[in-house]
């Protein structure tokens, strides 16, 4: 039975979400991004429409942006900035926005309708590899970026440890037991996915309090801009110490993960145990009281770990029970789950097991994220997830890797094919990136595909090139077309990283996480870099976006060339040519020095920025040392 408290909380949350005026919220965003003097020339109007729609037109000296919601109007503003103003708005708060002195008119009226209901963004891992040390300044820019790109279903899992702290202490665990159960901040994504406990814990109480405050700001702003934050819910992960209080509870140890010792393995409560429903109710009460709800919950049991049983009946009953504990507390609940587990462990997740698991939830109440669809479309292997709705997702980055990569043309073709063949099951387009990486064009391209059936790749790339420098420059367009035709023709893969990042060796690349292989001619990359440099000289000014591109393409070229030098060193060593080895070694040292100098040009590539942001969370010297160490061990 739903508690009276939770019912009241759900009603209050629903009223709070509806309180803001959409046009006013988007106007405030415009002021944040471009300043009041320019934003005053833009008027936002809310219109009635069937589905998500935005319209653009000029009226005298005003730019009129209309939409059915704050999110649609924000997407309209993003379209205007990108295609009319040649302005790039980065997700990185350190990158300044180069606005024109005056706003250009809209050449001809434009109307766009979203092709899908859901535009999803983020991944549990992003909250470790990229966002863990963010303050409100970084989050504010990023939420604006999401709105400008039409995202309306963002993962929102910050601050959940504060909720869990309340739940576990209510059940009787001590402060030390609870905070020691959590990992250090940078590893929390894998703790939340039931992979890892206790690593670099205990988690400081000041961290829990700060993240709670931050999450309140995050979900408030996301709702203001027409998004439905995907909040977490209980998936079965419990502290080992819970066995002390509930010795009869069916708590099992999960399989080992990621090479961590047994001391760090997680524990799972059988969903059919009566304690499961009790914990779910407590969690949803506490979370709704703190953060409200939009009735969308992310639950990902069995991610990269084995369930207690592989029997289809168990998997079906687990899914059925998890879902019922959601709807017992929130009748409108929509369960969102990533389907990485079906891809990464295909040997165990056979079709009968997947069908049993998915079929146990009423059709339409489980939204599946096809996690790595640019490489493997699980929806095609599962008869469109046996009727459950899904979001076609571009992954694009593993582990915060910094290789230029992405299969751009193929991605566009796959999205078009999914929209044509997915039937009533295709419900969204999005991205499950593990980190915000060095290929930002891929994500904006994917999200633009949610609003256009006939997106010309060449025209899109030209527009991208223009907004990187603020106007159309031939050399820059040519540079980006070279990159798209060579570098961006193959999807990102696990373990990609430049050889300069690997431990020194005469052959190979050491660990699987530092695979430097690339499929294109490095001379083409150099030609693109040269054309970008010429464009910068033609422009007589370097925007922040162009500085990023010059560093990004240049450091990839130098990193690729380092392989040639290393292999030359190995050849000289094998033939015992000391003089040649010394000469090549000097070239390698020079290249590494040049690479370091190049990377200092843009803060996005700075390790020091990462470490300093972590250190800033410390309330004293010991705290700062703890956070710095945690940041360096990810």
Language-model features: where?
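Positively charged n-region of N-terminal signal peptides that target proteins for export
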Residues: 1-5
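Hydrophobic h-region of N-terminal signal peptides that target proteins for export
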Residues: 9-18
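Contiguous, structured surface segment used for ligand recognition
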Residues: 20-116
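Acidic/histidine-rich, surface-exposed loop or edge segments in extracytoplasmic proteins
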Residues: 57-60, 123-127, 199, 545-549, ...
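Catalytic-core regions of glycoside hydrolase
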Residues: 88, 92-103, 122-126, 147, ...
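Active-site-adjacent substrate/metal-binding segments within catalytic domains
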Residues: 116-135, 146
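Active-site-adjacent structural elements in folded domains
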Residues: 282-286, 309, 512-516, 532-536, ...
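Ordered core of a single globular domain
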Residues: 543-596
């Amino acid at each position: 039975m739903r508690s009276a408290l939770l019912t009241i909380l759900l009603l209050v949350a629903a009223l709070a979400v509806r309180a803001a005026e959409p046009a006013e919220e988007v106007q405030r965003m415009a002021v944040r991004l471009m300043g009041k003097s320019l934003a005053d020339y833009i008027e936002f109007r809310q219109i009635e429409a069937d589905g998500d729609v935005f319209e653009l037109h000029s009226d005298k000296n005003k730019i009129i942006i209309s939409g059915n919601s704050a999110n649609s109007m924000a997407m309209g503003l993003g379209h205007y900035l990108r295609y009319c103003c040649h302005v790039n708005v980065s997700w990185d708060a350190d990158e300044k926005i180069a606005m024109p002195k005056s706003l250009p008119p809209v050449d001809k009226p434009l109307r766009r309708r979203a092709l899908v209901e859901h535009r999803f963004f983020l991944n549990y891992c992003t909250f470790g590899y990229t966002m863990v040390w963010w303050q409100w300044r970084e989050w504010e820019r990023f939420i604006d970026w999401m709105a400008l790109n039409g995202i309306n279903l963002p993962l929102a899992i910050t601050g959940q440890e504060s909720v869990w702290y309340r739940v576990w202490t209510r059940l009787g665990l001590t402060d030390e037991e609870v905070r020691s159960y959590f990992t250090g901040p940078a590893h929390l994504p894998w703790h939340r996915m039931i992979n890892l406990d206790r690593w670099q814990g205990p988690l400081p109480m000041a961290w829990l309090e700060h993240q709670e405050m931050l999450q309140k700001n995050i979900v408030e702003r996301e709702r203001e801009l027409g998004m439905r934050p995907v909040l977490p819910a209980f998936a079965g992960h419990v502290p080992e110490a819970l066995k002390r209080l509930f010795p009869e509870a069916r708590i099992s140890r999960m399989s080992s993960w990621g090479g961590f010792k047994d001391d760090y393995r997680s524990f799972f409560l059988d969903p059919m145990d009566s304690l499961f429903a009790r914990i779910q109710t407590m969690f949803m009460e506490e979370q709704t009281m703190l953060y409200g709800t939009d009735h969308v919950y992310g639950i990902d049991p069995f991610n990269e770990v084995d369930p207690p049983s592989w029997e289809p009946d168990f998997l079906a009953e687990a899914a059925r029970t998890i879902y019922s504990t959601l709807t017992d507390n929130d009748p409108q609940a929509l369960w969102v789950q990533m389907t990485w587990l079906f891809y990464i462990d295909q040997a165990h997740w056979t079709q009968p097991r997947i069908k049993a698991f998915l079929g146990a939830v009423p059709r339409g109440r489980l939204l599946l994220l096809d996690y790595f669809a640019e490489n493997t479309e699980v929806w095609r292997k599962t008869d469109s997830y046996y009727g459950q709705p899904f979001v076609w997702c571009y992954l694009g980055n593993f582990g915060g890797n910094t290789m230029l990569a992405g299969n751009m043309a193929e991605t566009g073709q796959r999205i078009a094919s999914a929209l044509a063949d997915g039937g009533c099951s295709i419900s969204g387009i999005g991205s499950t990136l593990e980190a915000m990486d060095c290929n930002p064009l891929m994500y904006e391209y994917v999200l633009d595909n949610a609003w256009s059936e006939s997106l010309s790749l060449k025209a899109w790339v030209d527009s991208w090139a223009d907004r990187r420098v603020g106007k159309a420059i031939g050399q820059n367009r040519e540079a980006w077309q070279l990159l798209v035709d060579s570098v961006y023709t193959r999807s990102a893969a696990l373990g990609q990283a430049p050889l300069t990042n690997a431990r020194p060796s005469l052959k190979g690349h050491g660990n699987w996480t530092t695979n430097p292989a690339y499929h294109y001619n490095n001379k083409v990359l150099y030609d693109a870099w040269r054309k970008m440099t010429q464009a910068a000289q033609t422009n007589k000014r370097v925007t922040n976006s162009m500085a990023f591109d010059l560093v990004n393409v240049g450091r990839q070229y130098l990193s690729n060339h380092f392989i040639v030098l290393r292999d030359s060193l190995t050849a000289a060593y094998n033939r015992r040519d000391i003089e040649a080895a010394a000469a090549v070694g000097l070239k390698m040292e020079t290249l590494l020095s040049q690479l370091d100098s190049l990377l200092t040009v843009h803060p996005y590539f700075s390790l020091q920025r990462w470490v300093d942001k972590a250190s800033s969370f410390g309330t004293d010297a010991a705290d700062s040392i703890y956070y710095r160490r945690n940041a360096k061990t990810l």
